[in-house]
């Protein structure tokens, strides 16, 4: 018994230390600006196939991020999601889900920003004995990007521009896999491709160099119930878009205080590393059908001296129309 306890403690320490081990390793990656440190609050950002990956009939979420607060005009991002279970059969272990994802960001003295809206349809199917679930999704949306030329300092601020607003369609697809090994361990893995059509976003002239490049995302999350009230949740995410890469890694620890409906209550805390860019701390409260979360990340990149290491803070809230059982003594399937 003593040996098992030591083994659990060592695994927990390894999970917590992973963000720092990766972050200070010798290789570096270039990251994109638009991202969230609270990955689970906006799962559709990583993969449309995660639409419907929840134990309920509907889910709604909003996340706000304020980055580089030390500058005069910080980079701000907000996203909102709505997901609905259209059909769901626990007998055949399959179903259909629909989702809506909205995102907007803005920064700089030119008031440059973008807005996106996407509709998502996903189909999921249980495999084998039901411990495996495969989800496939398609996404179609529209985006707009633009800036305010009247804020430019030039002889003729509009002379070189054909337009100051670009409106374009976007297409995406994704796949996700869920595997529950036993009552104490599960994992989910997903891969997606966004901007498959690579729309034109040029403000000057139509050019292949001014297209919104395809974005590849990979996301993995697991949970291991180390005891009746504790869960360890490692996470790994990767995004690639043209010459830019982003690698995030971290681990959360969740304390389940009450698992009986309707007074479900749990707390979570974790560390996240964005390689070569930032380190973040995440805090969350899960109460009944609500999830409240806060995150703060410190800038550890070469911009740290200019930003005074002030990175970003995030706040988010998620509401789920749930169908919880009276008591959950083990990890539930995220869908059925």
Spans of features found by a protein language model:
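Cleavable N-terminal export/targeting peptides
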Residues: 1-33, 322-336
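Subset of outer-membrane beta-barrel
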Residues: 32-336
């Amino acid at each position: 018994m003593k040996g098992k306890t030591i083994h659990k403690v060592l695994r927990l320490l390894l999970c917590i230390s992973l963000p720092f081990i990766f972050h200070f390793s010798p290789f570096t990656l270039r990251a994109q600006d638009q991202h969230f440190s609270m990955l689970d609050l906006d799962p559709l950002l990583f993969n449309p196939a995660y639409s419907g990956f929840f134990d309920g009939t509907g889910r709604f979420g909003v996340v706000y991020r304020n980055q580089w607060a030390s500058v005069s005009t910080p980079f701000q991002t907000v996203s909102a999601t709505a997901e609905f279970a259209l059909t769901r059969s626990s007998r055949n272990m399959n179903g259909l889900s629909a989702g809506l994802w909205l995102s907007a960001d803005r920064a700089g003295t030119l008031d440059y920003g973008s807005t996106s809206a996407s509709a998502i349809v996903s189909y999921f199917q249980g495999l084998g004995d039901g411990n495996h679930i495969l989800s496939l999704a398609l996404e179609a949306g529209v985006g707009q990007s633009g800036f305010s030329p009247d804020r430019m300092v030039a002889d003729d601020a509009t002379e070189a521009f054909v337009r100051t607003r670009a409106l374009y369609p976007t297409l995406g697809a994704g796949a996700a896999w869920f595997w529950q090994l036993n009552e104490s361990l599960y994992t989910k893995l997903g891969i997606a491709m966004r901007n498959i059509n690579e729309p034109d976003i040029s403000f000057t002239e139509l050019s292949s160099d001014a297209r919104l490049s395809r974005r590849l995302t990979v996301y993995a999350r697991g949970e291991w119930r180390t005891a009746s009230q504790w869960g360890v949740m490692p996470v790994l995410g990767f995004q690639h878009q043209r010459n830019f890469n982003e690698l995030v890694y971290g681990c959360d620890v969740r304390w389940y205080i009450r698992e009986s409906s309707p007074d479900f209550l749990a707390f979570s805390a974790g560390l996240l590393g964005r390689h070569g860019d930032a380190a973040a701390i995440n805090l969350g409260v899960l109460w009944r059908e609500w999830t409240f979360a806060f995150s703060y990340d410190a800038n550890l990149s070469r911009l740290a001296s200019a930003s005074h290491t002030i990175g970003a803070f995030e706040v988010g809230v998620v509401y789920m129309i749930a169908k919880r059982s009276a008591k959950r003594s083990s990890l539930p399937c995220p869908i059925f």
